[in-house]
Amino acid sequence: MKIRLDQYLVQHGLIQSRERAKAMIMSGVVFVNEQKVDKAGEMIKEDAKVEVRGHDIGYVSRGGLKLEKAMQCFPLTPNGKVCMDIGASTGGFTDCMLQNGAVKVYAVDVGYGQLAWKLRTDERVVNMERTNIRSVTPDQLGEPIEFFSVDVSFISLHHIFPVAQAITTPDAMGVCLVKPQFESGREKVGKNGVVRDPATHCEVLHNAMGYAAANGFSVRGLDFSPVKGPEGNIEYLMFVQKSAEPAVLDDSVAKQVVEASHSTLDH
């Protein structure tokens, strides 16, 4: 079975809209089976290898698309706020924050030399590379964080929320990427590190909401990331806000989001 290339890009979460997909295809950054394709209506096989190369997605990395979707789905904005990008890597979230009005972004990552040059040289960015978020203190920052994002690997959100609680303002908002492959027991992680079972995804979201609430954050929204993880894992966006009376969403909401993610991203 074949599908239009622009449709494929949207259905598989590589690009947010058909309009943007068409523009990017025409700009020559979309490759199918290692061959550049510049016609949006090109019919391709469902199992084709499709890549978007370069930075024409509008951000230095695909992380920007994740935060972009969160801002479309949830009532949140980094505009006018002091922000933190936890697990910054290349800086997709940082880039998106700046493009949406952030006054300052602390870009935190344990790695070194990954942050895009345009962000390293931006005076609004505080590059905190070689930094484990678990060691960051309020005194080290000197000011509270008003908006934060979390996109970390090989560590559970269970370890992130206590720090987020300590360094943020009383009404801080955040977007956390929930990754089943790093929140599940080893016995539930399948071949190539991929967690496919929807029931496990529901369990992971239930636990993640619990971690948030236990550290003073209400869970105000859930949706799925428009971009799969590197190995093909479906990941989720969790919108949290600090609260004196933390509350979580009903598990039925998580189940609906999981079902929607699989029907949209798994073909």
Give the residues covered by each predicted segment:
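Conserved class I S-adenosyl-L-methionine
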Residues: 79-89
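S-adenosyl-L-methionine
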Residues: 106-159
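Glycine-rich SAM-binding Motif I of class I
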Residues: 91-92, 113
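Flexible, glycine-/basic-rich loop-and-beta segments that form/coincide
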Residues: 234-267
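A short glycine-rich, Lys/Arg-flanked "PGG" loop and its adjoining helix->strand segment in the class I
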Residues: 158-175
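Conserved S-adenosyl-L-methionine
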Residues: 96-104
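Short, glycine-/aromatic-enriched active-site segment of Class I SAM-dependent methyltransferases
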Residues: 180-197
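A basic, amphipathic helix-loop patch mediating RNA/tRNA/ribosome contacts
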Residues: 1-48, 82-83
